């Protein structure tokens, strides 16, 4: 039963951090330092990825009408625009499929550690502050998803590759990239959400396939632990997404940049002292 409680904690962490630009993987790595499951390393590695399914389902539920090209409540033009949006999203995911799949295991093996996480937390924290200060007087070139060109969508997808490095934040990399290219904060955030659907569904499916291919099982407590983590991450992510969308209507991302810097410094201090 203790692992169920830990799954709740990890689900909360995942739900809060998945779509805020502060790195869910980085936070899960850090939380794992203090809350270790009494499960195999194989299961824990799978859990830390598949728990994202709950967060992704929160996006699907929140945007179901907007993302559903078959909705009977949409006219022909709206349905066509939805198909166009999906084509841009899928185009943006292609770089992650081509480059990310071959490198993913290598990145996990060599870069999943506190030193890399703390460095990327600080680096991207600084970038958020610098870019927001630079862009505050500029008018976005793309203020809605309909005007977002295919080439821009592809460039945003290339920025997603940076999130292969632990601690970067998938949403952080894509939002920063989109803002640099000239989208509004709101468009950057929504497009990042939509890119997460195929990206993270694919990552979770791949992790599950590898888990079962290597003899893994979800029998007994393990299945319950995973289910609890996914459900909790769904509920918390739903609330986090609503918060972020309201927040960026009136604020920029600098607060998240400062948070990343402070957390990165604390991580360096903590691990330097205990090791």
Swiss-Prot record:
Biological processes per GO annotation: cell wall organization; peptidoglycan biosynthetic process; regulation of cell shape; response to antibiotic
Pfam families assigned: BacA
Coiled coil residues, start to end: none
Gene encoding the protein: uppP
NCBIfam families: PRK00281.1-2, PRK00281.1-4, PRK00281.1-5, undec_PP_bacA
Major localization class: membrane
S-S pairs: none
Subcellular location: Cell membrane
Its job: Catalyzes the dephosphorylation of undecaprenyl diphosphate (UPP). Confers resistance to bacitracin.
Domain of life: Bacteria
UniProt EC number: 3.6.1.27
Keywords: Antibiotic resistance, Cell membrane, Cell shape, Cell wall biogenesis/degradation, Hydrolase, Membrane, Peptidoglycan synthesis, Transmembrane, Transmembrane helix
Protein name: Undecaprenyl-diphosphatase
Any one GO molecular-function label of the UniProt entry: undecaprenyl-diphosphatase activity
């Amino acid at each position: 039963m203790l692992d169920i409680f830990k799954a709740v904690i990890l689900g909360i962490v995942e739900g809060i951090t998945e779509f805020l630009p502060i790195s869910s993987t980085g936070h899960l790595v850090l939380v794992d330092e203090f809350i270790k499951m009494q499960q195999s390393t194989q299961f824990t590695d799978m859990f830390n990825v598949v728990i994202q399914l709950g967060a992704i389902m929160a996006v699907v539920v929140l945007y179901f009408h907007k993302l559903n090209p078959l909705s009977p409540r949409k006219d022909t033009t709206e349905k066509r625009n939805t198909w166009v949006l999906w084509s841009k999203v899928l185009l943006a995911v292609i770089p992650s499929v081509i480059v990310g799949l071959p490198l993913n295991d290598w990145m996990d093996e060599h870069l999943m550690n506190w030193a890399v996480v703390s460095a990327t937390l600080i680096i991207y924290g600084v970038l958020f502050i610098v870019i927001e200060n630079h862009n505050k007087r500029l008018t976005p070139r793309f203020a809605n998803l309909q005007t977002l060109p295919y080439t821009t969508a592809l460039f945003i997808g290339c920025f997603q590759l940076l999130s292969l490095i632990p601690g970067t934040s998938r949403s952080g990399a894509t939002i920063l990239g989109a803002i640099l290219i000239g989208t509004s904060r709101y468009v950057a955030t929504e497009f990042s959400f939509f890119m997460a659907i195929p990206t993270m569904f694919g990552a979770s499916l791949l992790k599950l396939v590898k888990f079962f291919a290597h003899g893994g099982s979800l029998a007994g407590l393990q299945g319950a632990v995973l289910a609890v983590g996914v459900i909790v991450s769904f509920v918390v992510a739903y609330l986090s997404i609503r918060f972020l969308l309201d927040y960026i209507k009136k604020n920029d991302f600098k607060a998240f940049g400062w948070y990343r810097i402070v957390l990165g410094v604390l991580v360096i201090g903590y691990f330097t002292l205990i090791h």
